[in-house]
């Protein structure tokens, strides 16, 4: 039977939500009611499948850790008042921490003036953010298109590469195995995980995949495409594969890819949605080897964990194909004043507090600690890898990885696997994590591994 719309029900639900938004604390009964409501509404109106993948489950099987508010810069507090050190970082959005006061203040100040732009008048913050990114990014990157997410920034990069290369008769794209570039149709064509691709086949034509880190395979593919007339428009890469399991390519791989792109007249698109904004110990991961892309994709941490924003930054030569008709690719909310205020404040914090350098220092500390633990627990841990504050602990199987995430949750540390894969647990905390909190994380990991060894031996 079709359900009739109910304005009264919608009004009551929205009023109840607004009342909750105003509250800073909940009493015990309110907490219980909210937990129950959230579970019910996820099941009935969001997607029941999410309940199966959430790691925040108590020993009794209750989803007791419904997010309520940020604690400090590096912690979250649930509806029961329990505080968790965040080593997940919203999959890389909280580089400057939770509710960073500089970012929040910038957004609040802009909100008091004008939240969204008119679409007709020139908006100052979009201009200032574009100028800032032109100064911050490497090489000849100069012009920016703004959007709302990483997927959108990749879509824009693909369209921009097509617009630039189509008159040159180049239509093929090369991506890599294990890549994740998003889940909209164009971005998904570059993504390499069958779980996400298969239900939506056929995807965009012209996408090829080669093994990540294999420069010979890249050269062979470029050469074969040229021989068959399928000339390559662009190569799209993550400098470090995030969702693929924090996979680092061999030293020299990115410069070699850049050289091949120049040789074959292909553009180089670097997807730094997850590795950018200081995450790996440099402002952008490509700077570790001084690689300069033709197009750079940014998002996630660009908004400071306060506002969603993505950016596609390109050289003047490439971006100029949009000069004659700037409406060829646009988005209503892209580059809105609130998002631009957040991004400008985020960049300011990253630079004034030298957070990329802090990420390098603290990342080395955590990686060294995790590697020592891996040596103590070779029966549980296969490998520890990473760069800066983007790390992964690879376990011997999915079950051990899932149990590790659950044990860390019980120790009040949030971690999670890569998408649909608990064998590799990602550690991606805010760059503002204190040295004391780094020590707490390592102590929690030691306790979690000790508990896992006992449970494995008893099984």
Swiss-Prot record:
Alphabetized SUPFAM superfamilies for the sequence: PLP-dependent transferases
Alphabetical list of InterPro entries matching this protein: Aminotrans_3 (IPR005814), Aminotrans_3_PPA_site (IPR049704), Class-III_PLP-dep_AT (IPR050103), Putrescine_aminotransferase (IPR017747), PyrdxlP-dep_Trfase (IPR015424), PyrdxlP-dep_Trfase_major (IPR015421), PyrdxlP-dep_Trfase_small (IPR015422)
Sequence positions bearing N6-(pyridoxal phosphate)lysine: 300
Assigned EC number: 2.6.1.82, 2.6.1.29
Keyword Oxidoreductase recorded: no
Keywords associated with the record: Aminotransferase, Pyridoxal phosphate, Transferase
Stated family: Belongs to the class-III pyridoxal-phosphate-dependent aminotransferase family. Putrescine aminotransferase subfamily.
Protein name: Putrescine aminotransferase
Gene name for this UniProt entry: patA
């Amino acid at each position: 039977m079709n359900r009739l719309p109910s304005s009264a029900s919608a009004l009551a639900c929205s009023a109840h939500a607004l009342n909750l938004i105003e509250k800073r604390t909940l009493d015990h009964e309110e907490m219980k009611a909210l937990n129950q409501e959230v579970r019910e509404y996820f099941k009935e109106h969001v997607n029941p499948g999410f309940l199966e993948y959430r790691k925040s489950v108590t020993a009794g099987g209750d989803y007791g850790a419904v997010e309520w508010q940020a604690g400090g810069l590096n912690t979250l507090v649930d509806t029961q008042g329990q505080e968790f050190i965040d080593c997940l970082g919203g999959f890389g959005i909280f580089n400057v921490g939770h509710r960073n006061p500089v970012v929040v203040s910038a957004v609040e100040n802009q909100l008091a003036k004008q939240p969204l732009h008119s679409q007709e008048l020139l908006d100052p913050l979009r201009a200032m953010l574009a100028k800032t990114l032109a100064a911050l990014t490497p090489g000849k990157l100069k012009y920016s298109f703004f959007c709302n997410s990483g997927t959108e920034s990749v879509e824009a990069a693909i369209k921009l590469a097509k617009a630039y290369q189509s008159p040159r008769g180049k239509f093929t794209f090369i991506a890599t195995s294990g890549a994740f570039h998003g889940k909209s149709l164009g971005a998904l064509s570059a993504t390499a995980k069958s779980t996400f691709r298969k239900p939506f086949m056929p995807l965009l034509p012209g996408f090829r995949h080669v093994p990540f880190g294999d420069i010979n395979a890249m050269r062979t593919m470029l050469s074969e495409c040229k021989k068959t007339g399928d000339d390559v428009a662009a190569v799209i890469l993550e400098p470090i594969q995030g969702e693929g399991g924090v996979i680092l390519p061999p030293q020299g791989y990115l410069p070699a890819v850049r050289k091949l792109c120049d040789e074959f007249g292909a553009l180089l698109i670097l997807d730094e949605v997850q590795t950018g904004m200081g995450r790996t110990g440099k402002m952008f991961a490509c700077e570790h080897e001084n690689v300069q892309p033709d197009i750079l994709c940014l998002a996630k941490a660009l908004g400071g964990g306060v506002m969603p924003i993505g950016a596609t930054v390109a050289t003047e030569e490439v971006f100029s194909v949009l000069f004659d008709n700037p409406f060829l690719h646009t988005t209503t909310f892209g580059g809105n004043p609130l998002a631009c205020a957040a991004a400008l404040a985020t960049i300011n914090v990253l630079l004034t507090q030298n957070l990329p350098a802090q990420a390098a220092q603290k990342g080395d500390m955590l990686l060294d600690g995790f590697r020592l633990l891996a040596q103590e627990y070779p029966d549980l841990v296969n490998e520890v890898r990473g760069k800066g504050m983007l790390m992964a602990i690879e376990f011997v199987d999915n079950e051990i990885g899932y149990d590790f995430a659950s044990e860390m949750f019980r120790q009040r540390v949030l971690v999670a696997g890569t998408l649909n894969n608990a064998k590799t647990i990602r550690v991606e905390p805010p760059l503002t994590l204190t040295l004391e909190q780094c020590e707490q994380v390592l102590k929690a990991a030691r306790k979690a591994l000790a508990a896992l060894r006992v449970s494995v031996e008893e099984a």
